[in-house]
Structure formats: C-alpha cells, structure tokens
Amino acid sequence: VRPLFLLLMAIVLFAAGLLQAGEQDAIRTAGDVLLAVLPASAAGLTWYHHDFQGTLQFARAASLTLGVTFGLKYLVNEKRPDGGEHSFPSGHASLSFCAAEFMRKRYGGSVTIPAYAAAAFVGYSRVASKRHYTHDVLAGAALGIGSSYFFTRPWHGWCVQLDGGSRHGMLRLSRAW
C-alpha cells in the first residue's frame, strides 16, 4: 500500500503546483489524469491484495455511480458554465469520489487522505475549467461516496476511519473476521 500512497501524494502535490501556476488548461488536464488514476488505484489495490470480493464491490459501486450519473445528466440536462450540455451531476466527481470512498472503506489507512485530496482536486478542476458548477460537483461527490459506502465492506485487515460526526471527532479501528 505504501507505493500507492506515495504515488497518490506525488500526484496531489503536482496538482497543487498547478493550482499555484493558475493555468486553467493544466488544471483541467491534471483533473482528467486524476480521474483515470483514482479508479485505477482502487482496482489496483484489489489486485495487490488478491481481493476478488473487493473487485466486485468496486465494480458494483462504480456501475451504480456511472448509471445514476448519466441517467441524471440526460434527465436534468443542465447547461454547463461553458455553454455545453449535461452539467448535472459531475461524472468526474462522482467516479473520483466513488474510488476514494471505496479505498477508504475497504482498506482505510494511508490511502484515505491522498485519495480524497485527489478526488477533491478533480472536483475543483471541473469548476475551475468552467465545465461544472459547484453544485454539480457536490452532487457527483455525494453520489459516488454513497454508492461506494453502500456496496463496500471493510477488508479482512484492519480498517481505520476518521469520524467527524461528534463535537470532538473520533478515530475508529475495525477489523472484519
């Protein structure tokens, strides 16, 4: 898992550098690259752990995410900020957050923060490049997180989760048997 953590951190730091440069095309391209990297990382983790059940869980979550996302795009047909069609919800955000939540819930640990940071950058890139409104990205993120949360079960190893629901926050350790 450590090589994946380092790869995700390198990509997030690269994306942060683009933010400082402020180049809209570079930010959009970095978001597109992360859109491919996040699901590939989620699938790669299942392969690394020889976790066939995890592969099925991620496939189900991603399928539901994409099906609902594209169904809503054609049902709502909201105009994009750049004048295009099918803005709501953001497919980039939905799939990115689906992958990030899958990695968090299935494996926890060191991949959680960089995966969510990368997914957040994907969402930011969609708004910065005028492809989506903020509410498109938030709806896509909620859809992706919800799908993965519903379909994913913690792996048989230890799972570390941060819970901000209480006033003080909580760190939860769990292990599936």
Question: Predicted regions span which residues?
Answer:
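Hydrophobic core of alpha-helical transmembrane segments in multi-pass integral membrane proteins
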Residues: 38-45
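Interfacial segments of alpha-helical transmembrane regions
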Residues: 45-64
